[in-house]
Amino acid sequence: KDSSAWENIPVPNAEIAEGFDRIPMWVADMNFQTAPSVCEAITKRLEHQVFGYFNPSEDYYNSIINWQKVRNGVEGLTKEAIGYENGVLGGVVAALQAFSAPGEAILVHSPTYTGFTSVLNNNGRRAVHTELKRDAEGIWRMDYEDMEAKIRKYHIHAAIMCSPHNPTG
């Protein structure tokens, strides 16, 4: 057992109002069992017994190419046009390098996942914060007027948006 979602929900002795339930909404913890094909692939990979960095396989690229073709009607996509990242922050860095230059202002919600602000600082970008507003029901909402004003004022060309439903990641 190693899943908080499965082991700790429901929380013992917690009072829940009638008609409500608890739904865990973490970023990476799964709320469902893993598909047998995934377990089989992991078991097969374990037989190799050497774990380190790897290059994506042809199956990796082909699955993306096929997905884009079937789902979005994209024709002519090649593996050379597909990037590969091991994590979210690496992908954010790649996007920042592609769409902004050092010294430029990047719009970011506040509060936000601290990894995003660290990536901006470590890559020479300036974070311009736009505050999320908490409404009367306690729900975080984007302040579109503030966002537009800051985009104009700071000549912003790129933004990092974290889910307003989970603003700190």
Label the predicted regions:
Residues 1-87, 94:
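N-terminal small-domain helix-loop-helix segment of the aminotransferase-like
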Residues 51-169:
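Conserved core of the PLP fold type I
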